[in-house]
């Protein structure tokens, strides 16, 4: 379980601590940092994975260089330049000491804390700007010295998996079959309407038992009987429909509630044992709708 997230110099946040618990709902005005908090969790996980891939099984060396991360690899945080990750786009501090200009890097610090197996753990990462296309990631420094000791990466943190699901717009009428990597890229770019049939197809093909649970849930909630997704080789597309009141309909004919619920269920089953981050910017309008 995650308990707290500390964010420094990331996008709209200069320095903030976010208390986390078993289930958390972020509520606030537009552009107040709700999505940014989720993206900070995603960036922390991306950095940790890249670090562990390169330095797995090794002790953290004091002078070890950071792992390079390309901004295009952070598909859930799409920006035209890596500089947009930094608070107010500031990647360097410029000052003057005894008439001499002094510069220093502005680092993004992300510290995640949690509890696992009745033990508390704390894992901090720092990110240094390299250029518009990439940045460096390394374990968080423990002091501000020239060659600082660095925070150890706890074993409990290595197993954390985070899946970020942006809001869904209107469902596309056709959908080309995609590999898993392409699905993740489109989800990260917010193009969830282009992958719903692909997610259904993956679950139906690889996890038929879970697909039955999904279809049963949709039928009980919406009275719609989902058909199995079918790959149409001639067009390279995935076709899928449902039946309601004895009428066969294409999935694009379903209501937004049905489509969004199906997206959430398939995404959860496609990312088992993961912390699911759901971004729904229109959720605050539900109170207004109920008043009408």
What are the functions of these language-model segments?
Residues 97-104, 129-131, 231-235:
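Short, ordered beta-strand-loop transition motifs
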Residues 40-120:
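Conserved P-loop NTP-binding catalytic core
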Residues 117-142, 261:
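A short, surface-exposed beta-strand/turn
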Residues 24, 112-116, 129:
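Beta-strand elements of well-folded, non-transmembrane domains
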Residues 111-115, 140-142, 146, 159-275, ...:
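Extended helical coiled-coil dimerization/tether regions that scaffold
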Residues 1, 14, 102-108, 119-121, ...:
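Residues at beta-strand starts and edge strands
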Residues 153-157:
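Short, conserved catalytic or adaptor-binding loops enriched in Gly and charged residues
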Residues 1-57, 228-292:
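Switch/communication elements of ASCE P-loop NTPase nucleotide-binding domains
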């Amino acid at each position: 379980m995650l308990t707290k997230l500390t964010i420094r110099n990331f996008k709209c946040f200069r320095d903030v601590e976010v208390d986390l618990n078993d289930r958390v709902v972020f509520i606030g005005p537009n552009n107040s940092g709700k999505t940014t908090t989720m993206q900070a969790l995603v960036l922390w996980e991306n950095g940790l994975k890249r670090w562990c891939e390169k330095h797995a099984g090794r002790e953290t060396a004091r002078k070890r260089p950071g792992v390079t991360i390309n901004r295009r690899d952070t598909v859930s945080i799409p920006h035209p330049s890596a500089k947009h990750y930094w608070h107010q786009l500031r990647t360097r501090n410029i000052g003057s000491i005894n008439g001499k200009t002094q510069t220093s890097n502005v680092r993004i610090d992300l510290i995640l804390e949690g509890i696992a197996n009745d033990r508390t753990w704390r894992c901090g990462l720092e990110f240094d700007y390299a250029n518009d296309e990439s940045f460096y990631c390394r374990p968080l420094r423990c002091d501000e010295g020239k060659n600082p000791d660095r925070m150890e990466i706890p074993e409990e943190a290595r197993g954390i998996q985070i899946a970020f699901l942006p809001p869904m717009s209107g469902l596309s009428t056709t959908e080309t079959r995609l590999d898993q990597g392409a699905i993740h890229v489109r989800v990260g770019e917010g193009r969830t309407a282009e992958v719903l049939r692909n997610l259904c197809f993956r679950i139906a093909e690889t996890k038929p038992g879970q697909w039955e649970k999904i279809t049963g849930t949709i039928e009980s909630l919406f009275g719609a009987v989902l058909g199995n997704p079918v790959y149409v080789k001639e067009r390279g597309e995935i076709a899928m429909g449902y039946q309601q009141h004895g009428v066969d309909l294409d999935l694009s004919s379903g209501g937004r509630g049905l489509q969004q619920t199906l997206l959430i269920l398939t995404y959860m089953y496609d990312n088992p044992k993961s912390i699911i981050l759901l971004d729904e910017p229109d959720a605050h309008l539900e109170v207004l709708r109920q008043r009408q």
